[in-house]
UniProtKB/Swiss-Prot annotation:
It catalyses: L,L-cystathionine + H2O = 2-oxobutanoate + L-cysteine + NH4(+); L-cysteine + H2O = hydrogen sulfide + pyruvate + NH4(+) + H(+); L-homocysteine + H2O = 2-oxobutanoate + hydrogen sulfide + NH4(+) + H(+); L-homoserine = 2-oxobutanoate + NH4(+). The modification N6-(pyridoxal phosphate)lysine is found at K212. It is found in: Cytoplasm. InterPro entries: Cys/Met-Metab_PyrdxlP-dep_enz, Cys_met_metab_PP, PyrdxlP-dep_Trfase, PyrdxlP-dep_Trfase_major, PyrdxlP-dep_Trfase_small. Catalyzes the last step in the trans-sulfuration pathway from L-methionine to L-cysteine in a pyridoxal-5'-phosphate (PLP)-dependent manner, which consists on cleaving the L,L-cystathionine molecule into L-cysteine, ammonia and 2-oxobutanoate. Part of the L-cysteine derived from the trans-sulfuration pathway is utilized for biosynthesis of the ubiquitous antioxidant glutathione. Besides its role in the conversion of L-cystathionine into L-cysteine, it utilizes L-cysteine and L-homocysteine as substrates (at much lower rates than L,L-cystathionine) to produce hydrogen sulfide (H2S). One of its GO terms (biological process) is protein-pyridoxal-5-phosphate linkage via peptidyl-N6-pyridoxal phosphate-L-lysine. The gene is CTH. The lineage of its organism: Eukaryota, Metazoa, Chordata, Craniata, Vertebrata. GO terms for cellular component: cytoplasm. It comes from the Eukaryota. This is Cystathionine gamma-lyase. It comes from Sus scrofa.
Protein backbone atom coordinates (compact mmCIF):
# COMPACT_ATOMS: atom_id res chain seq x y z
CA UNK A 1 0.00 0.00 0.00
CA UNK A 2 1.14 3.53 -0.73
CA UNK A 3 0.01 6.91 0.53
CA UNK A 4 -0.32 10.13 -1.44
CA UNK A 5 2.24 12.86 -0.84
CA UNK A 6 1.62 16.25 -2.38
CA UNK A 7 5.35 17.05 -2.36
CA UNK A 8 6.36 13.99 -4.38
CA UNK A 9 7.13 15.91 -7.63
CA UNK A 10 5.05 13.43 -9.61
CA UNK A 11 6.73 10.31 -8.23
CA UNK A 12 4.86 7.31 -6.86
CA UNK A 13 3.09 7.79 -3.52
CA UNK A 14 5.19 6.95 -0.46
CA UNK A 15 4.95 3.43 0.97
CA UNK A 16 2.35 3.29 3.72
CA UNK A 17 3.40 2.79 7.35
CA UNK A 18 7.11 3.07 6.45
CA UNK A 19 8.16 5.21 9.42
CA UNK A 20 6.16 3.09 11.85
CA UNK A 21 7.68 -0.11 10.52
CA UNK A 22 11.20 1.34 10.57
CA UNK A 23 10.79 2.19 14.25
CA UNK A 24 8.99 -0.93 15.48
CA UNK A 25 9.60 -3.94 13.20
CA UNK A 26 11.93 -6.43 14.85
CA UNK A 27 12.34 -4.23 17.93
CA UNK A 28 9.73 -5.84 20.22
CA UNK A 29 10.76 -5.45 23.90
CA UNK A 30 9.12 -8.80 24.68
CA UNK A 31 12.00 -10.66 23.01
CA UNK A 32 14.30 -9.65 25.87
CA UNK A 33 14.08 -10.73 29.51
CA UNK A 34 14.77 -7.10 30.44
CA UNK A 35 11.98 -5.81 28.13
CA UNK A 36 14.50 -3.32 26.71
CA UNK A 37 12.85 -0.81 24.37
CA UNK A 38 16.11 -0.39 22.44
CA UNK A 39 17.61 -3.73 21.35
CA UNK A 40 20.82 -4.34 23.31
CA UNK A 41 24.22 -4.97 21.73
CA UNK A 42 24.90 -8.67 22.10
CA UNK A 43 28.69 -9.03 22.04
CA UNK A 44 28.80 -12.65 23.13
CA UNK A 45 30.42 -14.90 20.55
CA UNK A 46 28.73 -18.04 21.86
CA UNK A 47 25.47 -19.03 23.54
CA UNK A 48 24.60 -21.64 26.16
CA UNK A 49 22.88 -24.79 24.94
CA UNK A 50 20.33 -26.67 27.05
CA UNK A 51 21.71 -29.98 25.83
CA UNK A 52 24.18 -30.98 23.10
CA UNK A 53 22.79 -29.60 19.84
CA UNK A 54 19.81 -27.94 21.56
CA UNK A 55 20.06 -24.16 21.42
CA UNK A 56 17.48 -21.43 21.83
CA UNK A 57 18.01 -19.83 18.42
CA UNK A 58 21.66 -18.85 18.64
CA UNK A 59 24.78 -20.97 19.01
CA UNK A 60 27.75 -19.05 17.61
CA UNK A 61 27.75 -15.41 16.56
CA UNK A 62 29.03 -16.04 13.02
CA UNK A 63 25.92 -18.11 12.30
CA UNK A 64 23.50 -15.78 14.07
CA UNK A 65 23.44 -12.91 16.54
CA UNK A 66 20.50 -11.33 18.44
CA UNK A 67 21.46 -7.76 17.50
CA UNK A 68 21.91 -8.70 13.83
CA UNK A 69 18.60 -10.54 13.97
CA UNK A 70 16.75 -7.35 15.00
CA UNK A 71 18.30 -5.47 12.09
CA UNK A 72 17.51 -8.19 9.58
CA UNK A 73 13.87 -8.40 10.63
CA UNK A 74 13.49 -4.63 10.29
CA UNK A 75 15.10 -4.50 6.84
CA UNK A 76 12.97 -7.38 5.57
CA UNK A 77 9.81 -5.50 6.50
CA UNK A 78 11.00 -2.26 4.89
CA UNK A 79 11.86 -4.08 1.67
CA UNK A 80 8.58 -5.98 1.59
CA UNK A 81 10.61 -9.19 1.86
CA UNK A 82 10.37 -12.46 3.74
CA UNK A 83 14.07 -12.58 4.56
CA UNK A 84 17.03 -10.28 5.02
CA UNK A 85 20.70 -10.89 5.78
CA UNK A 86 23.27 -8.44 7.12
CA UNK A 87 26.83 -8.68 5.79
CA UNK A 88 30.19 -7.22 6.74
CA UNK A 89 30.07 -4.88 3.72
CA UNK A 90 28.27 -4.37 0.46
CA UNK A 91 31.07 -6.17 -1.37
CA UNK A 92 30.89 -9.02 1.15
CA UNK A 93 27.24 -9.37 0.14
CA UNK A 94 28.22 -9.24 -3.54
CA UNK A 95 30.89 -11.92 -3.13
CA UNK A 96 28.50 -14.18 -1.23
CA UNK A 97 25.80 -13.79 -3.89
CA UNK A 98 28.22 -14.73 -6.67
CA UNK A 99 29.11 -17.89 -4.74
CA UNK A 100 25.64 -19.11 -5.69
CA UNK A 101 27.21 -19.72 -9.12
CA UNK A 102 29.72 -22.28 -10.32
CA UNK A 103 32.73 -21.85 -12.60
CA UNK A 104 31.63 -21.43 -16.20
CA UNK A 105 28.45 -19.57 -15.38
CA UNK A 106 27.92 -16.08 -16.78
CA UNK A 107 27.17 -12.87 -14.91
CA UNK A 108 25.66 -10.02 -16.90
CA UNK A 109 26.40 -6.75 -15.14
CA UNK A 110 25.14 -3.29 -15.94
CA UNK A 111 28.06 -1.53 -17.60
CA UNK A 112 27.78 1.54 -15.36
CA UNK A 113 28.17 0.21 -11.81
CA UNK A 114 30.01 1.04 -8.62
CA UNK A 115 33.75 0.87 -9.22
CA UNK A 116 34.25 -1.73 -6.50
CA UNK A 117 31.66 -4.00 -8.10
CA UNK A 118 33.31 -3.55 -11.50
CA UNK A 119 36.72 -4.34 -9.99
CA UNK A 120 35.44 -7.45 -8.21
CA UNK A 121 33.69 -8.84 -11.28
CA UNK A 122 36.56 -8.03 -13.64
CA UNK A 123 39.63 -8.81 -11.52
CA UNK A 124 38.43 -11.40 -9.00
CA UNK A 125 35.27 -13.23 -10.05
CA UNK A 126 36.61 -13.73 -13.57
CA UNK A 127 39.74 -15.33 -12.12
CA UNK A 128 37.55 -17.97 -10.46
CA UNK A 129 36.03 -19.05 -13.76
CA UNK A 130 32.94 -16.86 -13.92
CA UNK A 131 32.22 -15.25 -17.28
CA UNK A 132 31.54 -11.53 -16.92
CA UNK A 133 29.71 -9.44 -19.51
CA UNK A 134 29.13 -5.71 -19.06
CA UNK A 135 25.95 -4.61 -20.83
CA UNK A 136 23.82 -1.46 -20.90
CA UNK A 137 20.79 -3.07 -19.25
CA UNK A 138 18.81 0.15 -19.61
CA UNK A 139 18.29 -1.05 -23.20
CA UNK A 140 16.15 -4.18 -23.09
CA UNK A 141 17.29 -5.44 -26.49
CA UNK A 142 20.94 -5.42 -25.41
CA UNK A 143 20.12 -7.37 -22.25
CA UNK A 144 18.09 -9.89 -24.22
CA UNK A 145 20.90 -10.35 -26.74
CA UNK A 146 23.50 -10.89 -24.02
CA UNK A 147 21.71 -13.79 -22.33
CA UNK A 148 23.15 -17.23 -23.11
CA UNK A 149 22.51 -20.74 -21.74
CA UNK A 150 25.39 -20.06 -19.32
CA UNK A 151 23.79 -16.90 -17.89
CA UNK A 152 22.98 -17.45 -14.23
CA UNK A 153 22.90 -13.94 -12.76
CA UNK A 154 22.03 -10.43 -13.94
CA UNK A 155 23.31 -7.55 -11.79
CA UNK A 156 21.91 -4.04 -12.14
CA UNK A 157 21.98 -0.76 -10.28
CA UNK A 158 19.24 1.81 -10.70
CA UNK A 159 20.09 4.59 -10.71
CA UNK A 160 23.58 3.62 -11.80
CA UNK A 161 26.80 4.85 -10.26
CA UNK A 162 27.93 7.45 -11.24
CA UNK A 163 26.02 8.28 -14.47
CA UNK A 164 22.61 7.85 -12.76
CA UNK A 165 20.93 5.91 -15.55
CA UNK A 166 17.56 4.49 -14.60
CA UNK A 167 16.81 0.86 -15.43
CA UNK A 168 13.31 -0.54 -15.78
CA UNK A 169 13.40 -3.28 -13.14
CA UNK A 170 10.09 -4.80 -14.19
CA UNK A 171 11.15 -5.00 -17.84
CA UNK A 172 14.47 -6.58 -16.85
CA UNK A 173 12.68 -9.12 -14.66
CA UNK A 174 10.37 -10.12 -17.50
CA UNK A 175 13.32 -10.69 -19.83
CA UNK A 176 15.47 -12.50 -17.28
CA UNK A 177 12.77 -14.81 -16.00
CA UNK A 178 11.83 -15.93 -19.52
CA UNK A 179 15.15 -17.71 -19.65
CA UNK A 180 14.80 -20.12 -16.75
CA UNK A 181 16.79 -20.10 -13.56
CA UNK A 182 18.55 -16.73 -13.82
CA UNK A 183 18.80 -14.61 -10.67
CA UNK A 184 18.10 -10.87 -11.01
CA UNK A 185 19.94 -8.78 -8.42
CA UNK A 186 19.23 -5.08 -7.94
CA UNK A 187 21.73 -2.95 -6.06
CA UNK A 188 19.35 -0.53 -4.35
CA UNK A 189 22.04 1.44 -2.50
CA UNK A 190 21.29 4.84 -4.05
CA UNK A 191 17.51 4.72 -3.61
CA UNK A 192 17.30 2.95 -0.24
CA UNK A 193 14.23 1.01 0.83
CA UNK A 194 12.38 4.31 1.21
CA UNK A 195 12.34 5.30 -2.46
CA UNK A 196 12.34 1.94 -4.28
CA UNK A 197 11.30 -1.68 -3.70
CA UNK A 198 12.97 -3.89 -6.32
CA UNK A 199 11.42 -7.14 -5.08
CA UNK A 200 7.92 -5.82 -5.77
CA UNK A 201 9.04 -5.11 -9.34
CA UNK A 202 10.28 -8.64 -9.99
CA UNK A 203 13.85 -8.72 -8.69
CA UNK A 204 14.97 -11.90 -6.94
CA UNK A 205 17.46 -10.19 -4.66
CA UNK A 206 17.67 -6.61 -3.40
CA UNK A 207 21.05 -5.66 -1.99
CA UNK A 208 22.62 -2.59 -0.41
CA UNK A 209 25.82 -1.13 0.70
CA UNK A 210 24.17 -0.20 3.98
CA UNK A 211 27.20 1.99 4.60
CA UNK A 212 25.31 4.59 2.61
CA UNK A 213 21.70 5.74 3.05
CA UNK A 214 20.36 2.78 5.02
CA UNK A 215 22.70 3.59 7.90
CA UNK A 216 23.06 7.22 6.92
CA UNK A 217 25.72 8.39 9.34
CA UNK A 218 29.04 7.46 7.67
CA UNK A 219 30.08 5.38 10.67
CA UNK A 220 29.26 1.82 9.59
CA UNK A 221 30.56 -0.44 6.82
CA UNK A 222 27.86 -3.03 6.08
CA UNK A 223 25.90 -4.84 3.39
CA UNK A 224 22.27 -5.95 3.34
CA UNK A 225 20.42 -8.49 1.21
CA UNK A 226 16.63 -8.96 1.05
CA UNK A 227 14.74 -11.69 -0.80
CA UNK A 228 11.61 -13.83 -0.82
CA UNK A 229 12.89 -17.22 -1.98
CA UNK A 230 13.32 -19.69 0.88
CA UNK A 231 15.75 -21.71 -1.24
CA UNK A 232 17.97 -18.73 -2.03
CA UNK A 233 17.79 -17.53 1.56
CA UNK A 234 18.90 -20.89 2.94
CA UNK A 235 21.73 -21.08 0.43
CA UNK A 236 22.93 -17.54 1.17
CA UNK A 237 22.74 -18.13 4.91
CA UNK A 238 24.88 -21.25 4.47
CA UNK A 239 27.37 -19.41 2.27
CA UNK A 240 27.58 -16.48 4.67
CA UNK A 241 28.32 -18.79 7.58
CA UNK A 242 30.87 -20.70 5.50
CA UNK A 243 32.62 -17.61 4.14
CA UNK A 244 32.40 -15.64 7.39
CA UNK A 245 31.03 -12.45 5.83
CA UNK A 246 29.22 -11.26 8.96
CA UNK A 247 29.01 -7.77 10.49
CA UNK A 248 29.88 -6.94 14.07
CA UNK A 249 27.05 -6.58 16.62
CA UNK A 250 28.03 -2.95 17.18
CA UNK A 251 27.66 -2.17 13.48
CA UNK A 252 24.30 -3.96 13.47
CA UNK A 253 23.18 -1.83 16.40
CA UNK A 254 24.25 1.39 14.67
CA UNK A 255 22.59 0.50 11.36
CA UNK A 256 19.43 -0.57 13.17
CA UNK A 257 19.41 2.83 14.85
CA UNK A 258 20.00 4.57 11.52
CA UNK A 259 16.87 2.98 10.06
CA UNK A 260 14.73 4.79 12.61
CA UNK A 261 15.34 8.11 10.86
CA UNK A 262 15.48 6.79 7.30
CA UNK A 263 12.17 8.38 6.32
CA UNK A 264 12.97 11.88 7.58
CA UNK A 265 16.51 11.72 6.23
CA UNK A 266 15.47 10.63 2.74
CA UNK A 267 12.78 13.30 2.54
CA UNK A 268 15.40 15.94 3.34
CA UNK A 269 17.89 14.41 0.90
CA UNK A 270 15.18 14.62 -1.77
CA UNK A 271 14.37 18.24 -0.94
CA UNK A 272 18.02 19.30 -0.90
CA UNK A 273 18.95 17.18 -3.91
CA UNK A 274 16.19 18.68 -6.03
CA UNK A 275 17.13 22.23 -5.00
CA UNK A 276 20.83 21.70 -5.73
CA UNK A 277 20.12 19.98 -9.06
CA UNK A 278 17.89 22.83 -10.19
CA UNK A 279 20.51 25.35 -9.09
CA UNK A 280 23.30 23.60 -10.97
CA UNK A 281 21.18 23.19 -14.09
CA UNK A 282 20.75 26.95 -14.27
CA UNK A 283 24.43 27.72 -13.58
CA UNK A 284 26.44 29.05 -16.55
CA UNK A 285 29.63 27.27 -15.42
CA UNK A 286 27.97 23.85 -15.48
CA UNK A 287 27.84 21.93 -18.76
CA UNK A 288 25.23 19.31 -17.83
CA UNK A 289 23.40 18.01 -14.75
CA UNK A 290 22.30 14.40 -14.30
CA UNK A 291 19.56 13.91 -11.70
CA UNK A 292 16.57 11.56 -12.16
CA UNK A 293 14.32 14.07 -10.40
CA UNK A 294 14.80 16.65 -13.15
CA UNK A 295 12.56 16.61 -16.25
CA UNK A 296 15.76 16.92 -18.30
CA UNK A 297 16.88 13.44 -17.23
CA UNK A 298 16.33 11.07 -20.19
CA UNK A 299 14.58 8.51 -17.97
CA UNK A 300 12.71 10.94 -15.74
CA UNK A 301 9.35 9.37 -16.58
CA UNK A 302 10.65 5.90 -15.72
CA UNK A 303 11.93 7.22 -12.40
CA UNK A 304 8.48 8.59 -11.61
CA UNK A 305 6.82 5.27 -12.49
CA UNK A 306 9.26 3.17 -10.49
CA UNK A 307 10.26 5.22 -7.45
CA UNK A 308 8.65 7.26 -4.70
CA UNK A 309 11.31 9.96 -4.90
CA UNK A 310 15.01 10.61 -5.44
CA UNK A 311 17.99 10.64 -3.08
CA UNK A 312 20.65 13.32 -2.88
CA UNK A 313 22.90 11.84 -5.56
CA UNK A 314 23.73 14.27 -8.38
CA UNK A 315 26.33 14.02 -11.12
CA UNK A 316 27.31 16.97 -13.28
CA UNK A 317 29.92 18.04 -15.79
CA UNK A 318 31.75 21.22 -14.95
CA UNK A 319 32.75 23.33 -17.93
CA UNK A 320 36.44 23.19 -18.74
CA UNK A 321 39.02 20.50 -18.05
CA UNK A 322 40.39 18.29 -15.29
CA UNK A 323 42.13 21.36 -13.89
CA UNK A 324 38.78 23.13 -13.45
CA UNK A 325 37.23 20.06 -11.83
CA UNK A 326 40.10 19.69 -9.37
CA UNK A 327 40.10 23.40 -8.53
CA UNK A 328 36.36 23.26 -7.93
CA UNK A 329 36.67 20.30 -5.58
CA UNK A 330 39.56 21.82 -3.64
CA UNK A 331 37.63 25.09 -3.28
CA UNK A 332 34.57 23.57 -1.59
CA UNK A 333 34.06 24.49 2.06
CA UNK A 334 30.88 22.70 3.17
CA UNK A 335 31.05 19.77 0.76
CA UNK A 336 33.85 17.45 1.82
CA UNK A 337 36.10 15.95 -0.86
CA UNK A 338 35.70 12.28 -0.02
CA UNK A 339 34.50 8.96 -1.37
CA UNK A 340 31.30 7.22 -0.24
CA UNK A 341 27.85 8.75 -0.02
CA UNK A 342 24.51 8.71 1.74
CA UNK A 343 25.51 10.27 5.05
CA UNK A 344 24.05 13.36 6.67
CA UNK A 345 27.07 15.36 5.50
CA UNK A 346 27.53 16.54 1.92
CA UNK A 347 30.35 14.96 -0.08
CA UNK A 348 31.87 15.57 -3.50
CA UNK A 349 34.23 13.46 -5.56
CA UNK A 350 35.79 12.95 -8.99
CA UNK A 351 34.81 9.43 -10.13
CA UNK A 352 37.44 9.16 -12.89
CA UNK A 353 40.23 9.50 -10.32
CA UNK A 354 38.52 8.28 -7.16
CA UNK A 355 35.63 5.78 -6.95
CA UNK A 356 35.86 4.56 -10.56
CA UNK A 357 39.60 4.74 -11.17
CA UNK A 358 39.73 0.92 -11.39
CA UNK A 359 37.40 1.00 -14.40
CA UNK A 360 39.52 0.89 -17.58
CA UNK A 361 39.92 4.34 -19.13
CA UNK A 362 38.43 3.23 -22.44
CA UNK A 363 35.31 2.01 -20.62
CA UNK A 364 35.09 5.21 -18.59
CA UNK A 365 35.10 7.27 -21.76
CA UNK A 366 32.32 5.19 -23.32
CA UNK A 367 30.24 5.44 -20.14
CA UNK A 368 30.71 9.19 -19.87
CA UNK A 369 32.93 9.12 -16.77
CA UNK A 370 35.03 11.99 -18.03
CA UNK A 371 37.60 14.01 -16.09
CA UNK A 372 35.03 16.80 -15.67
CA UNK A 373 32.31 14.57 -14.17
CA UNK A 374 31.69 15.39 -10.52
CA UNK A 375 29.50 13.31 -8.22
CA UNK A 376 27.75 14.94 -5.28
CA UNK A 377 26.16 13.30 -2.28
CA UNK A 378 23.91 16.09 -1.06
CA UNK A 379 23.47 15.93 2.70
CA UNK A 380 21.11 17.39 5.24
CA UNK A 381 22.57 20.88 5.67
CA UNK A 382 20.60 24.03 4.88
CA UNK A 383 20.12 23.93 1.12
CA UNK A 384 20.95 27.60 0.58
CA UNK A 385 24.31 27.09 2.31
CA UNK A 386 25.01 24.16 -0.01
CA UNK A 387 24.13 26.16 -3.12
CA UNK A 388 26.26 29.07 -1.94
CA UNK A 389 29.20 26.72 -1.44
CA UNK A 390 28.84 25.22 -4.90
CA UNK A 391 28.54 28.68 -6.43
CA UNK A 392 31.71 30.02 -4.83
CA UNK A 393 33.65 26.87 -5.78
CA UNK A 394 32.47 27.09 -9.39
CA UNK A 395 33.57 30.72 -9.50
CA UNK A 396 36.94 29.76 -8.00
CA UNK A 397 37.39 27.18 -10.75
CA UNK A 398 36.54 29.77 -13.43
CA UNK A 399 37.79 33.09 -12.00
CA UNK A 400 37.67 34.87 -15.37
CA UNK A 401 34.00 33.95 -15.79
CA UNK A 402 32.94 34.59 -12.19
CA UNK A 403 31.25 37.90 -12.92
CA UNK A 404 28.06 36.27 -14.23
CA UNK A 405 26.13 37.28 -11.10
Amino acid sequence: MQEKDVSSHGFLPRFQHFATQAIHAGQEPEQWASKAVVPPISLSTTFKQEAPGQHSGFEYSRSGNPTXNCLEKAVAVLDGAKYSLAFASGLAATVTITHLLKAGXQIISMDDVYGGTNRYFRQVAAEFGLKISFVDCSKSKLLEAAITPETKLVWIETPTNPILKMIDIEACAQIVHKHGDIILVVDNTFMSAYFQRPLALGADICMYSATKYMNGHSDVVMGLVSLNSETLHSRLRFLQNSLGAVPSPIDCYLCNRGLKTLQVRMEKHFENGMAVAQFLESHPLVEKVIYPGLPSHPQHELAKRQCTGCPGMISFYIKGSLHHAETFLKSLKLFTLAESLGGYESLAELPAIMTHSSVPKSDREVLGIRDTLIRLSVGLEDKQDLMDDLDQALKAAHPTNASHN
